[in-house]
Amino acid sequence: NYIPELYRRGVKNFVVTNVPKGYASDYPGANFLKVVNTLEALQRLAERHRDEFNIPIVGITGSNGKTMVKEWLYQLLSPSMFVTRSPRSYNSQIGVPLSVWLMNEQTQVGVFEAGISMPGEMLALRDIIQPTIAVLTNLGAAHQENFSSMEEKCREKLILFHDAETVIYDGDDEVISKVIAEYPDY
């Protein structure tokens, strides 16, 4: 149970699946929002937050190199504009919404990683990031055990590209080129 420690540290708002017994007396001034699924609640909240920004957003996916590309873009862009980026390697189902939540009124461009380890994960990340620019770094063996083929993994990663205005990928990679050819809009 993480609530007592967080409350001691000053956190007063909690999203929970079960409201703790005695919450009014044990946690005066705290608010508890009860939801069916805390992960989905976090993701939907981040999605709504992202909707508030009409700025360039770079979404980066790939088997390797996401963090390096993100940090390189940050170093390139940050001298001339305020960039919000994923901290460290926050590219998971929890890390992406926490990263997007960091955007504020100063943010001029967002740069976020999106990592997946199984089919069905990229849709939620795409809806949160909503990239205007999408980058596929490479396609490798990482997390391959949950996919039936490299093509299946590539298709899952390309979900991030759905509404992007600009798509960047390695056109020399045979698998990526083959799967990209299935999507004439790219």
Show the residue positions of the predicted features.
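Phosphate-binding loop of NTP-binding sites
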Residues: 39-185
